[in-house]
Amino acid sequence: MEKNQLILSVKDLNIKFNLRGKVLHAIRGIDLDIYHGEVLAIVGESGSGKSVFTKSFMGLLDANGSITSGTIDYYGADDGKPIRLSDLKKEKDWLKVRGHEIAMIMQDPMTSLNPLKTIGDQIMEAVELHQGLKGAAAREKTLEYLRDVGIADPEVRFKQYPHEFSGGMRQRVVIAIAVACNPQILICDEPTTALDVTIQAQILELLKEMRVKYNLTIILITHDLGVVANIADRVAVMYAGDIVEIGTSDEIYYDPRHPYTWALLSSICLLYTSDAAD
């Protein structure tokens, strides 16, 4: 798929949840087009609907939630045929999408890793399932992913367990697993929240590198506008289940239009690099 081609299109999407007899309208008529190769940041405070919105792309809504109207169309499939994600109901259909087409990195890497399996086995499982490699070929590919995400001594680390890794290293492993699935779209849900500032910057830089090397489209979910200044091509600002403003990073940072965007910007202190200022 060529850069800047439409890869995902959301039209008038509405999602509701039944909560003890009451209806919560979580997503309110969102329209959004996402293009191959871009990094789109979705920014908003906790409870604004960011995670609910993107989980709907993978059929991961809680049992009491559902898409009540609107469409989600995916255009990145190998056969070139669009897939209407909003119409998928069966788990077997979603299994064709999850991982291979759209993968997700969660906020806490420990919830994504099996504490009873070695790091190498967990990455290799994704390689075997989504790339069809076996044995020595799968192992060598796994070592390659460990190197790509910046983990030193991959042959040694291959045999170690999650508790033997720091938080930043675990997040690198989770990124390796996601990329090993060969996805077109990588959703990163608050991937740096649990990390200190220095490690945050390293993980964001790694995501930029993975985007280029593996030809990914990245959707970055965060409550902090400060972490997206030097990674996002576009920024969508969410408030109360709707996208209230969308634009390039420069437009959002230097010429915000919506009062909520102003409020988010006023809550952070940014040190702009010369590249960002240019």
What are these regions (language model features)?
Residues N4-L6, K81-L85, A152-V156, T248-S274:
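Short catalytic/signature loops enriched in Gly
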Residues V43-G44:
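The feature captures the beta-strand-to-loop junction immediately N-terminal to the Walker
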Residues A180-Q184:
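A short, proline-enriched helix->beta-strand linker immediately N-terminal to the Walker B motif
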Residues V228-N230:
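A short, surface-exposed alpha-helical micro-motif characterized by mixed small hydrophobic
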Residues R234, I246:
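Short, glycine/charged-rich "phosphate-handling" switch motifs in NTP-dependent
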